[in-house]
Amino acid sequence: MCSGGFAKCLGISLIPLAILCVFCNILLFFPGGMIVSDNAHITPEVWYFGGILGSGVLMIFPALVFLGLKNNDCCGCCGNESCGKRFAMFTSIIFAALGVLGAGYSFIVSAVAVHNGPTCLFYNETWTNPFNDGSVYQKCFLFHCLFHPVDYLYNHTLWDSCKEPVGIVTWHLTLFSMLLVMSLIQAVLCAIQVINGLIGAICGDCCGCCGSTDGAV
């Protein structure tokens, strides 16, 4: 397979991932599937727009560039005859690096969100992040904490500390975990294109010379 054809496959894979990441980020603005009355009730990491900006908007640009590489002929790229195939592959490296940065940003935001937990209505009728500010551990009985992990990721009994929205911990973990995994996949795909682009820029694509009819498709 030519470098351009392989890049097109990567671009096709990035598009649905970017759409899913945007969708997950939008759903996070509705904790537990509910419309909140105060924006302060939304988990802070949601406002960093990791899925919308990092894995969404920034990922569209490299995806479109990867898709266009297959259509570049051997004499030029994007209709410009002064621009060769190797320059097109070199340009894709820059956009692939941009994709890695965007996916990395989304990955870091998602990892922090999973670690900190959601904002919810605590048992003392205050909206807070009980798993991050230590509030939940004040409710934890001594003997219970001795024999059960105090990290909410491992001790599901702590999830009951969140009264509202209903099922917010599951909602939070599911969506941010999806963003975590998908952003990691995006970063890997873009990193692969960096290598593919280097090969294409140094060695050239596998298509024939300008005007050749026996080049690879």
Regions found by a protein language model. Give the residues of each.
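Non-transmembrane, juxtamembrane loop and terminal tail segments
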Residues: 209-217
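Low-complexity, compositionally biased segments
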Residues: 41-42, 136, 217
